[in-house]
């Protein structure tokens, strides 16, 4: 799932309607085993304060129908608000002309969010069904999104809320696994160092636990105003130095435009988010 990063808010008076003219300054690429997982990961990777398709700060929109008709950089969050307000997939399709397949997948995320909201409690983590928690993680929900949906943010510090969900998730055995990307589309078996994390799996494709000969380099993410290829080149130079010193080099990044995400640049490339949850599992 590739998503452009628009920095239209930094340009005074710019038209925010999207068309054939390129207005993005960068892009991210998210990989998952479900569309729901990939789109939510991608929306977080953009790095503009959004946590996914749901559980964001509410947009103030005077006319939802008009906002749905206009293709802007915030359109996907307008769709989220419309679903929350009770719009159906068919209604949103009629206004946006977006294929119903995509809208059905986004509605799946909204339905799971509503299920989580039904367990909202005051002050402490409710005993939500493990199957629901696993379903949320498979659909790309972050620990923060789950904490916000359960109302934990209102009773405790944000970091405490995230840790409460994280600890419960780990105690239930809900952990991500490392999967290889098949660069040959199953034409024949292939072993690659092109990896990603997913909650849709039961076993790791590579062994990494106890590996003390590897050094991890964190990528700089999507290009944006003030951060471009020069920062990525620092990461590439770090990878080269690590290899020269006899260590295995590991890159974590999610920018498909960069040199550091060429999988021949390092021993293992994790095409995934650079976040606390992903770095510590």
Q: Which positions does each model-derived feature cover?
A:
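Gly-rich Lys/Arg/Thr-decorated short loops/hinges at beta-loop-alpha junctions or inter-strand turns
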Residues: 20-22, 57-63, 114, 215-226, ...
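Short acidic-hydrophobic, aromatic-tinged amphipathic segments that line or gate anion-handling sites
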Residues: 269-275
């Amino acid at each position: 799932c590739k998503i452009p990063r628009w920095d239209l808010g930094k340009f005074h008076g710019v038209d925010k309607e999207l068309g054939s003219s390129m207005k993005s300054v960068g892009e991210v690429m998210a990989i998952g085993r479900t569309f729901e997982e990939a789109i939510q990961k991608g929306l977080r990777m953009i790095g503009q304060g959004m946590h996914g398709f749901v559980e964001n700060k509410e947009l103030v929109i005077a006319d939802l129908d008009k906002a749905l008709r206009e293709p802007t950089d915030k359109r996907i969050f307008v769709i989220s608000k419309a679903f929350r307000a009770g719009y159906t997939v068919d209604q949103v399709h009629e206004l946006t002309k977006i294929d119903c397949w995509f809208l059905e997948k986004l509605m799946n995320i909204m339905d799971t969010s509503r299920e989580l909201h039904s367990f909202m409690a005051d002050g402490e983590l409710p005993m939500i069904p493990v199957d629901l928690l696993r379903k949320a993680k498979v659909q790309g929900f972050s620990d923060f999104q789950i904490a916000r949906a359960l109302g934990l943010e209102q009773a405790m510090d944000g970091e405490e809320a995230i840790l409460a969900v994280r600890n419960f998730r780990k105690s239930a055995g809900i952990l991500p696994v490392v999967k290889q990307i098949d660069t040959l589309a199953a034409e024949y078996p292939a072993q690659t160092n092109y990896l990603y994390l997913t909650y849709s799996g039961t076993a790791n494709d590579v062994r990494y636990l106890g590996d003390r000969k590897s050094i991890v380099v964190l990528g700089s993410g999507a290009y944006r105003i003030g951060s471009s290829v020069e920062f990525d080149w620092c990461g590439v130079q770090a990878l080269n130095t690590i290899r020269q010193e006899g260590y295995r080099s590991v890159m974590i990044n999610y920018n498909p435009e960069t040199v550091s995400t060429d999988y021949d640049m390092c021993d293992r490339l994790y095409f995934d988010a650079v976040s606390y949850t992903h770095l510590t599992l």
